[in-house]
Amino acid sequence: MKIFFVSSSSIALEVFKEIVKHYEVVGVLTLPDRPKGRGQKLSQNVIKSEAIARNIKVLDPLILDDNVLNLVRDLNPDLMLVFSYGKIFKKEFLDLFPKGCINVHPSLLPKYRGVSPIQSAILNGDCVSGVTIQSMALEMDSGNILVQKNFKIRSYDTSHDISKLVSSLSPSLVLEALEKISKGFLGIPQKSSEATFCSFLKKESGFIDFNLSAFEIKNKINACNPWPLVRVRLDYNDIIFHRADFLEVDLYKERKIGEIVDFNPEKGLFVNTGKGILLLLEVQRPGRKVLDFKSFYNGSRQLIGQVFSSIE
């Protein structure tokens, strides 16, 4: 089976490396090089770099026009495998592949159709999520389910953590799906009545209100890592929150909302909220390295009693 691989994200790199061991990858479709770093020099994504290193033809157009369709048609692929690309495919593009098109989606479809399933699961405080290998349809993330595997989300897991987990789980699931397809399996239709949807996070998604519950705040902190990251102020200085947990207790009702009320070397830096205690686990001062809460506490002047304020 000749495969046309489509991705623009590092989350798909392990899948790509595994697929080329077992199948002929006749081409790769990815996004164009983008400016990166202080110098804003054009930089390839890791999928493009890996494909070039393996002498696999790469297409990186701005738009999927007729010229791109003809280039893909000339490669004579059997199947398209998509994992985090960022563009919508029209019917004439999907029709190029006689054995169909499949997609790796990091949720338990039909839950969280859309572009931010990992972040949405964490933002909503889900304890379980998963990976779905689905056939592709014109309606986004509505195709038949070929393979599905669930996993637990720990209370302190970030979007970055779950992305790494999805990356490690996906190669074997894709191989399983391709084996099923080779045997004529068409997949199991989704229950569209149970579908939920998610959209892009925005920069302002990193704003928090300490009047919310500790559960809601820690979900936002963890969901927004690695982007856009939650920023607050402490003594007129910006502080970035990278990881948090929470306690469902109200021990400090008389203290100010957002106040640092305690330090526990086993649990975290305690912050009072509208309901419960926020446990800060990893923080950063802009331009400096990310610190665990112990290093942040030991490297700061008296923190207990200081108050975090929201950035609006």
UniProtKB/Swiss-Prot annotation:
Species name: Borreliella burgdorferi (strain ATCC 35210 / DSM 4680 / CIP 102532 / B31)
Keywords noted in UniProt: Protein biosynthesis, Transferase
Enzyme class at the top of the EC tree: transferase
GO MF, any single term: methionyl-tRNA formyltransferase activity
Entry's EC annotation: 2.1.2.9
Reaction catalysed by this enzyme: L-methionyl-tRNA(fMet) + (6R)-10-formyltetrahydrofolate = N-formyl-L-methionyl-tRNA(fMet) + (6S)-5,6,7,8-tetrahydrofolate + H(+)
Record's function text: Attaches a formyl group to the free amino group of methionyl-tRNA(fMet). The formyl group appears to play a dual role in the initiator identity of N-formylmethionyl-tRNA by promoting its recognition by IF2 and preventing the misappropriation of this tRNA by the elongation apparatus.
NCBIfam families: fmt
Family listed: Belongs to the Fmt family.
InterPro entries (UniProt xref): Fmt, Formyl_trans_C, Formyl_trans_C_sf, Formyl_transf_N, Formyl_transf_N_sf, Formyl_transferase-like_C_sf, Met-tRNA-FMT_C, Met-tRNA-FMT_N
This protein's name: Methionyl-tRNA formyltransferase
Cellular compartments per GO CC: cytosol
Keyword Transferase: yes
Superkingdom classification of source: Bacteria
Pfam families, sorted: Formyl_trans_C, Formyl_trans_N
Chain positions recorded as (6S)-5,6,7,8-tetrahydrofolate binding sites: S107, L108, L109, P110
